[in-house]
């Protein structure tokens, strides 16, 4: 009679190797899927859509011609949170600029919350840059906002928007303080 437990160590090793291979293959598939997703986003650039909602000073909702809703985070800027000083003003300013307007999205990526991250054009106007110029957002250097540093400095000197506050708090710092 055959002993089914005779090769237990070999079976355990085979099972472990199979499991490791499965984990590796799954990770490679996920990596490839993200690469394809990012490549696909780049391929469909630019996207033209109508702004149908404003969440805050750096997030809006857009409706494409195919009736697809996109939650869009403005690339390279950081506006005050809604509960933060100048948060409501930043939201209103973005709304005044783009609500119910047809805009062009130049997608850069997708953020950890699943939002499309994009530079937004309204005709020849770079909306992201305009929010910084008008003093309703910081140049988000961590995410490519260094191109807007001069606009931020000019808004600070002119005391525009949030720069009227004697000591404005960056949204990232405000979020840490209000966890």
Q: Over which residues does each language-model region extend?
A:
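Small beta-barrel nucleic-acid-binding modules, primarily SNase/OB-fold domains
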Residues: 1-179
């Amino acid at each position: 009679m055959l002993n089914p437990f005779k090769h237990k160590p070999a079976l355990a090793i085979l099972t472990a190797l199979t499991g490791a291979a499965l984990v590796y293959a799954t990770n490679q598939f996920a990596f490839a899927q993200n690469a394809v997703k990012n490549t696909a986003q780049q391929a469909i650039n630019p996207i033209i859509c109508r702004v149908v909602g404003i969440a805050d000073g750096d997030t809006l909702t857009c409706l494409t011609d195919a009736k697809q809703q996109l939650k869009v985070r403005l690339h390279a800027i950081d506006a005050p949170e809604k509960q933060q000083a100048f948060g409501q003003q930043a939201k209103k300013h973005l709304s005044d600029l783009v609500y119910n307007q047809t805009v062009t999205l130049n997608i850069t990526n997708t953020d950890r919350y699943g939002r499309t991250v994009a530079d937004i054009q309204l005709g020849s106007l770079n909306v992201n840059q305009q929010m910084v110029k008008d003093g309703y957002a910081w140049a988000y250097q961590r995410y490519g906002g260094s191109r807007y540093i001069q606009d931020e400095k000019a808004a600070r000197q002119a005391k525009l928007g949030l720069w009227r506050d004697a000591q404005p708090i960056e949204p990232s710092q405000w979020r840490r303080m209000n966890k």
